[in-house]
């Protein structure tokens, strides 16, 4: 039995039945990382000794017949912008190279409380800015289905770790699609929760009104398990909602009779690969055959979402990243003439091209002469997009669309084509701008590459997403696929 190919709920079953030890599971994953990660590039840091130590502690509890917790003995990878005490937290940037976190993020605390085994920190686009993980300052992450293709981004390492069987579960962050798009490209399940459902405390900020931590797993049940473990109010993050977190496992039923699903025409227009369209339309038919009521709908302002997103996120990034200046935080240049030179050279040496591009754009739209024309107007557009979604959700329980207009593209194909790269998030960005939840799960294969189905629902209706996603998943076998790597 290959332990690395099992889901979290399968591992929980054999652990609780004492068919395997937590240490055995952990060592299997560490061996797998040592075997394949030089080619896949999922990890930036591996915490081997600590992982084995924690696994041994869980084995002692099992021997004493103590009750296991939600994640006991389950190997988890953490994106390298989420703090884990004693581990590096570089955001895949040279400016934070060598930084070790002195504390745990709230989500990390929750994973540790539920006895998940944290294997290490995962590769990403620098400061979560990118859609391919090609912007990592340290190494490329490769798609396990085809090593010549990208895994998506910015949580590319998080997707590769799960798809490449280097972790059972992982955490990513989603600002404009950074959990859902790599989940789609790598053939796994990824959730962007409602803004405020999961704490951002201890997560290095990119766009503070957009960032959300998102769970990733091999199937819907795994994703629901991790969401239940980390969701909820955090008094250290005033943007978290004081709303009870349901037991998402109860949502995992095959009953979707009467659920109303909207199909927005704006998500099926020009630019969508025809084979992707066909795969998504076939998935919609499955949901309809299983009892859902499917009707067309319209979100007419979606064409403006991408522009609003890049204005708002870049403005917030320029503000958030101002602290990395060589004085307060981050790399300090060794060759400087005066104080101004420290700032200039430290940031020039420390940040990559994409981060510099977005800082400059953000600074521009926040400047006195352009604030009203760009940033203020983008906030107004955002409000209208939110209203658009609310209007649709008066008539529908969920909306279904492709996650990405294409399957995974080749490494280097879009690296120098900024607009083409940005357009790869065209179906995920509107959801982030509105702050509503969405899940991506596999719905097909095209030329050996996975296709992602995106299901979107109203605020704090993650249970609806899990219900519909689970129903579809149980009707097909795409979630059982494993990259032959």
Swiss-Prot record:
The keyword Lipid metabolism does not apply. One of its GO terms (biological process) is translation. It catalyses: L-glutamyl-tRNA(Gln) + L-glutamine + ATP + H2O = L-glutaminyl-tRNA(Gln) + L-glutamate + ADP + phosphate + H(+). The active site is at residues 79, 154, 178. One of its GO terms (cellular component) is glutamyl-tRNA(Gln) amidotransferase complex. One of its GO terms (molecular function) is ATP binding. The keyword Protein biosynthesis applies. InterPro entries: Amidase (IPR000120), Amidase_CS (IPR020556), Amidase_dom (IPR023631), AS_sf (IPR036928), GatA (IPR004412). Disulfide bonds: none annotated. Pfam families: Amidase (PF01425). It is an enzyme of class 6 (ligase). Its EC number is 6.3.5.7. Keywords: ATP-binding, Ligase, Nucleotide-binding, Protein biosynthesis. Heterotrimer of A, B and C subunits. Belongs to the amidase family. GatA subfamily. Allows the formation of correctly charged Gln-tRNA(Gln) through the transamidation of misacylated Glu-tRNA(Gln) in organisms which lack glutaminyl-tRNA synthetase. The reaction takes place in the presence of glutamine and ATP through an activated gamma-phospho-Glu-tRNA(Gln). This is Glutamyl-tRNA(Gln) amidotransferase subunit A. It comes from Clostridium botulinum (strain Kyoto / Type A2). The gene is gatA.
């Amino acid at each position: 039995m290959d332990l690395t190919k099992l889901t979290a709920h399968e591992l929980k079953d054999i652990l609780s039945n004492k068919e395997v030890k937590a240490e055995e599971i952990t060592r299997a994953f560490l061996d797998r990382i040592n075997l394949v990660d030089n080619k896949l590039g999922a990890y930036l840091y591996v915490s081997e000794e600590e992982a084995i130590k924690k696994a041994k502690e869980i084995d002692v509890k099992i021997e004493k017949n103590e009750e296991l917790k939600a994640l006991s003995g389950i190997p988890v990878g953490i994106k390298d912008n989420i703090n884990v005490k004693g581990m590096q937290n570089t955001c895949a940037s040279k400016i934070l190279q060598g930084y070790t976190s002195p504390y745990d993020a709230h989500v990390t605390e929750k994973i540790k409380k539920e006895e998940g085994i944290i294997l290490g920190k995962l590769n990403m686009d620098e400061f979560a800015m990118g859609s391919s993980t090609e912007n990592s300052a340290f190494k490329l992450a490769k798609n396990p289905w085809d090593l010549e293709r990208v895994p998506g981004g910015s949580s590319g390492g998080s997707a590769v770790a799960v798809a490449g069987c280097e972790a059972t579960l992982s955490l990513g962050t989603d600002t404009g699609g950074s959990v859902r798009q790599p989940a789609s490209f790598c053939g796994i399940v990824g959730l962007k929760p409602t803004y405020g459902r999961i704490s951002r405390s201890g997560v290095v900020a990119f766009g503070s009104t957009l960032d959300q931590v998102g769970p990733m797993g091999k199937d819907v049940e795994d994703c629901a398990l991790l969401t239940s473990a980390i969701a909820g109010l955090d008094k250290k993050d005033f943007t978290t909602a004081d709303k009870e977190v349901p037991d998402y496992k109860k949502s995992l039923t095959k009953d979707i009779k009467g659920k109303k699903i909207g199909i927005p025409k704006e998500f099926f227009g020009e630019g969508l690969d025809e084979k992707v369209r066909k795969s998504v339309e076939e998935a919609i038919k499955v949901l309809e055959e299983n009892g859902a009521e499917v009707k067309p709908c319209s979100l007419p302002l979606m064409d403006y979402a991408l522009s609003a997103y890049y204005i708002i996120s870049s403005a917030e990034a320029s503000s958030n990243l101002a602290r990395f200046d060589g004085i307060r935080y981050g790399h300090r240049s060794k060759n400087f003439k005066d104080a101004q030179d420290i700032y200039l050279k430290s940031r020039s040496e420390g940040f990559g091209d994409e981060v510099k591009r977005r800082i400059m754009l953000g600074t521009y739209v926040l400047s006195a002469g352009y604030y009203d024309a760009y940033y203020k107007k983008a906030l107004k557009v955002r409000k209208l997009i939110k209203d658009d979604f609310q209007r649709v959700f008066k008539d529908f329980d969920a909306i279904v669309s492709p996650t990405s207009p294409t399957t995974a593209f080749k490494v280097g194909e879009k690296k120098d084509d900024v607009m083409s790269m940005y357009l790869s998030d065209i179906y995920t960005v509107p959801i982030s701008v509105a702050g509503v939840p969405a899940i991506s799960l596999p719905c097909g294969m095209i030329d050996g590459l996975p296709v992602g189905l995106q299901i979107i629902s109203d605020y704090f209706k993650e249970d609806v997403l899990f219900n519909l996603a689970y129903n579809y998943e149980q009707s097909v076998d795409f979630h059982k696929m494993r990259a032959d790597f």
